[in-house]
């Protein structure tokens, strides 16, 4: 199959194409002698290869653009003065220049072409072709997307979307093109193409295609979600976990008592919940074999570590964050033992869990939400942004990211809320807000307590527990749950002086109210104000 013709993309003089290379070929290619700089992979003591991504150790949201043309003009959620987001417009002229730069970089080279699927449902999946010159980038997309069988590859035909990764090329004339820097990640919805220039961060390819699924699916009545998902062992019901980076999506959905559907990107259609991906992209800072055995054990041959500190003899130091807090590993989903097979999809969700890591120490560890509160807190998408998932952020700061994933939303946030609510109403799913962050003790709520809370949500015991209502937010919270320290369930009890909680709660409630004002431009948004905090 290596007789692909790339000249239709403008790529010429290709000396060799490695088309969907095997893991063994990828391993040999990314560790071969003579590789320099960020192309070089280092074999670690666990068998996985580690690579470094240079100055970009996270996505670069300031460098994300959509070409403004008839395909995008009236549908994309463009950034505006009233509501800033990452969907910045780029001209057709700038696109032509950027595409030419990418094509020039990839011409006269030995290339990797990886044909993948995005979306586990055959009827709505997207065929995505990645073209790159760097072996480990081909490894990354092989891990992260759905790998076609030999038969599917033979009948693959033309892709629905093409990503050109020219990480070695720079946009030196970015000012005259109206861009932000020498780096660019740009999408063209008319030609169905993405170009990546001057960033080596693997996540740009993964999240790029997520932005595209987030564009297409809601327009065809499918909820598109930045969440992890799992099912009970019998496969009778699913649970979904929304949350921003570092709030526990991967950790909490990877559960020995449940089967994993996926850890980050899903759709919910009339049949149920399905994964967009074929792999996981887990944070590994301070990874500990005892508290996260599944993720630790997934780090073996074929897994790909990013920006982890590795000694010359291959010894890994997971605690070292000198390069970045956002150290990662990508691995094919079958590296996790308990997964839904053969296709990563499950039945309708019965529980919808919103994860927030609250650095203010205000939110209860778990709140039972009514339907209006569910919409309010989904649109608010609150967490304290944790260190290092994006450039230039190292201290926890409050973040409101609509639908727990504003960075990846290509349509207006209310569209995602609308589709999610439709599915929840159809199936009678319940919503819960879980704080995986801090409380008045100054310590982070333990993974053990959070797992106990998740167990109580999934086995229904939370719905039978005695409850009380927390002021300012009107959250209904349980006063006791099996296996959870009862002293943490009311956050006021974790403060030496409960008045401290009151003060912080007022501050946080005010932030929610101020943030939600941007959704009150229409009737639906106005109606939800009453479900939010009150001062």
From Swiss-Prot:
Gene3D superfamilies: 3.90.228.20, Phosphoenolpyruvate Carboxykinase, domain 1 (3.40.449.10), Phosphoenolpyruvate Carboxykinase, domain 2 (2.170.8.10). Its EC number is 4.1.1.49. It is found in: Cytoplasm. Its cofactor is Mn(2+). One of its GO terms (biological process) is gluconeogenesis. Mn(2+) binds at residues 207, 226, 264. GO terms for molecular function: ATP binding; metal ion binding; phosphoenolpyruvate carboxykinase (ATP) activity. ATP binds at residues 207, 226, 243-251, 292, 328, 444-445, 450. It catalyses: oxaloacetate + ATP = phosphoenolpyruvate + ADP + CO2. Keywords: ATP-binding, Cytoplasm, Decarboxylase, Gluconeogenesis, Lyase, Manganese, Metal-binding, Nucleotide-binding. Pathway: Carbohydrate biosynthesis; gluconeogenesis. Binds 1 Mn(2+) ion per subunit. GO terms for cellular component: cytosol. Substrate binds at residues 59, 201, 207, 328. Belongs to the phosphoenolpyruvate carboxykinase (ATP) family. Involved in the gluconeogenesis. Catalyzes the conversion of oxaloacetate (OAA) to phosphoenolpyruvate (PEP) through direct phosphoryl transfer between the nucleoside triphosphate and OAA. This is Phosphoenolpyruvate carboxykinase (ATP). It comes from Bacteroides fragilis (strain ATCC 25285 / DSM 2151 / CCUG 4856 / JCM 11019 / LMG 10263 / NCTC 9343 / Onslow / VPI 2553 / EN-2).
């Amino acid at each position: 199959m290596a007789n692909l013709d790339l000249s239709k993309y403008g790529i010429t003089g290709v000396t060799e194409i490695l088309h969907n290379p095997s893991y063994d070929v990828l391993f040999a290619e990314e560790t071969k002698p003579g590789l320099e700089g960020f192309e070089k992979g280092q074999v670690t003591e666990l068998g996985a290869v580690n690579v470094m991504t240079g100055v970009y150790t996270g996505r670069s949201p300031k460098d994300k653009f959509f070409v403004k043309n008839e395909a995008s003009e009236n549908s994309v959620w463009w950034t505006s003065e009233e509501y800033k987001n990452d969907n910045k417009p780029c001209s057709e002229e700038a696109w032509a220049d950027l595409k030419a730069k990418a094509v020039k970089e990839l011409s006269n080279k030995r290339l990797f072409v990886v044909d993948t699927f995005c979306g586990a449902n055959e009827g709505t999946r997207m065929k995505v072709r990645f073209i790159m010159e760097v072996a480990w980038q081909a490894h990354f997309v092989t891990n992260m997307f759905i790998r076609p069988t030999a038969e599917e590859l033979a009948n693959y035909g033309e892709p629905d979307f093409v990503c050109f990764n020219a990480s070695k090329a720079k946009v030196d004339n970015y000012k005259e093109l109206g861009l932000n820097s020498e780096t660019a990640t740009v999408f063209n919805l008319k030609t169905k193409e993405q170009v990546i220039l001057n960033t080596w961060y693997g996540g740009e390819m993964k999240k790029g295609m997520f932005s595209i699924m987030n564009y297409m699916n809601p327009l065809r009545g499918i909820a598109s979600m930045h969440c992890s998902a799992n099912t009970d062992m019998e496969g009778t019901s699913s649970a979904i976990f929304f949350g921003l980076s570092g709030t526990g999506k991967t950790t909490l959905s990877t559960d020995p008592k449940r089967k994993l559907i996926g850890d980050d990107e899903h759709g919910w259609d009339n049949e149920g919940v399905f994964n967009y991906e074929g792999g996981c992209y887990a944070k590994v800072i301070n990874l500990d074999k005892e508290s996260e055995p599944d993720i630790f054990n997934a780090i073996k041959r074929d897994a790909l570590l990013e920006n982890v500190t590795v000694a010359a003899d291959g010894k890994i130091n997971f605690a070292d964050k000198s390069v970045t807090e956002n150290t990662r590993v990508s691995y094919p989903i079958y590296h996790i033992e308990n997964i839904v097979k053969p296709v990563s999809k499950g039945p309708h969700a019965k529980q919808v869990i919103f994860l927030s890591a609250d650095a203010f120490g205000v939110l209860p560890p778990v709140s039972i939400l009514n339907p209006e509160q569910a919409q309010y807190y989904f649109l608010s998408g609150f967490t304290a942004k944790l260190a290092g998932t994006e450039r230039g952020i190292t201290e926890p700061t409050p973040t409101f990211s609509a639908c727990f994933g504003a960075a990846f939303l290509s349509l207006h946030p209310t569209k995602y809320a609308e589709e999610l609510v439709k599915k929840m109403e159809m199936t009678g799913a319940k919503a819960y807000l879980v704080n995986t962050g801090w409380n008045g003790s100054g310590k982070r709520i333990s993974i053990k307590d959070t797992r106990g809370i998740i167990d109580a949500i999934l086995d229904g015991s939370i719905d039978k527990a005695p409850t009380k209502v927390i002021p300012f937010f009107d959250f209904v919270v349980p006063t006791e749950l099996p296996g959870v320290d009862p002293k943490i369930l009311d956050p006021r009890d974790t403060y030496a002086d409960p008045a401290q909680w009151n003060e912080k709660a007022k501050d946080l409630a005010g932030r929610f109210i101020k943030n939600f004002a941007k959704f009150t431009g229409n009737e639906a948004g106005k109606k939800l104000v009453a479900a939010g905090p009150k001062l």
